[in-house]
Amino acid sequence: MNKAILAVAMVLLLAGCATKPEEIGRAPDLSPVAAHLGMQNNPQFNGYPARPGKASYSLWDQRSTNFFKDPRAATPGDVLTVIISINDRANLDNKTDRERVSKGIYGGGGSFATSSITGAAAGGDMDASINTHSDSKSKGKGTIERSEDIRLQIAAIVTDTLPNGNLIIRGSQEVRVNNELRVLNVAGVVRPRDISGNNTISYDKIAEARISYGGRGRLSEIQQPPYGQQILDQFSPF
C-alpha cells in the first residue's frame, strides 16, 4: 500500500514539473532540416527530377540558370519568400442589461350550507387565492482590446500541387539565442499568379494560412504554469 502511494506521489511530482527531464540544464534542440515537410513520405519529392549533368564538348551548362524560365516557384521543391506584416488592432465593448418581472394572482371563492341532525343550519364561506411573484435580472459587460504587430520574412517550400494548379507551401524557421528557441511556422495554399516577379508573396494572399510564432526554452516555460497546476485548474470545481 505504501509503495502504491509513493508511486502516485512521484507521478504527481513529475507532472508538476515545468521542464522536461531531458531538457534540464541544456538548451532546446533544433529540429532536423525538412522535419516539418514530410519529405520521406511525399512522392512529389521522391519523384523530383535530379539536376542534369554537364554535357561534354558543350559551351552551355544545363545546370546553370535558364534565362527564359520563370524564376517564380511553380513545382514541388521550389522555394519562395513569404512576407508577414500584421498590424492588427481590435476594440470590442459589449454590454447587456436584462430585467424581467412577473406577478400573478389566482383566486376563487364559494359558500356552502348544511343542516345538522337537530335541524340547525350551519353555513360558511370559502375563499382561496394564490399569489405569484418572480423577478429576474442579469447584467453583463465585456471588453476586449487587442494589438498585434508582426513583421517577418520566411522562406517556404512548395510541398504539393493541387489539381487546379494552386500550390501548397510550408515553411519553418528556428533561431536559438541564449537557450531560448524561437520558432516560426507558415503553411497554406497560394495561387501561382499571386507570386510576385521577385518570387515573394504576402501573407494576406495565402488561403488557409496557418502562421505561428512562438518559442521553447526557459523564458517560455516561466510564462506558463507547470503541467500539474494546469491539470488541477482544469478539473478543480473551485
Curated annotation (Swiss-Prot):
This is Flagellar L-ring protein. InterPro entries: Flag_Lring (IPR000527). One of its GO terms (biological process) is bacterial-type flagellum-dependent cell motility. Keywords: Bacterial flagellum, Cell outer membrane, Lipoprotein, Membrane, Palmitate, Signal. The basal body constitutes a major portion of the flagellar organelle and consists of four rings (L,P,S, and M) mounted on a central rod. The gene is flgH. It comes from Brucella suis biovar 1 (strain 1330). Assembles around the rod to form the L-ring and probably protects the motor/basal body from shearing forces during rotation. Residues 1-16 form the signal peptide. It is found in: Cell outer membrane; Bacterial flagellum basal body. GO terms for cellular component: bacterial-type flagellum basal body, distal rod, L ring; cell outer membrane. The keyword Lipoprotein applies.
